[in-house]
């Protein structure tokens, strides 16, 4: 896939590892194409493992493997079904996240759960650091789960129904834009969740200023603005009150 400023085509880590071990690599442009489906059928897979794959797997492929298609999902299902479970876990201030290995069906992360592992979040957890934690935990869980699946030692568990509002929708660049009328706690979580991508930002003189780190502070032991006669806290949100070597102190909602 394209990497770097020059957008040069580079092999993915999965492809590099496969080639290092002499394993064949097949990279269809669209997995739903008849040619791709037939090529996978010829492989006669016992199991298909899907991790962060950006295409919908057709039913013809889901039904092929003896042990099914399994997905390594970066949340404790049914929480955070969808494309961006990691960022939303940080954004919502969760204390615990985790990985679920599930048997895939035609729904969006709705298949039966096979195994799970919990991963605690640090107070300064970012989207990037949690990604690394869950990647390591998921790889370990997958290696443990596959032999159990083959031996019939895994009992599939159906997922309870959840509201569609609980889905972890895809993150867009605009989700990094800071609304200073929100609370300091919400903004601090947003900044951590959006690191390293798409990154939190604000507008300064018409230009985007990326913000990588922040912490919540209480000025003068309380809400400074409630002590200023005639001060409107909402209108003053986003105003810089202190700028020194430690950074900027900005009023929030």
Language-model segments: residues:
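One-carbon transfer enzymes
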Residues: 1-198
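An anion-binding loop in the catalytic cleft
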Residues: 181-253
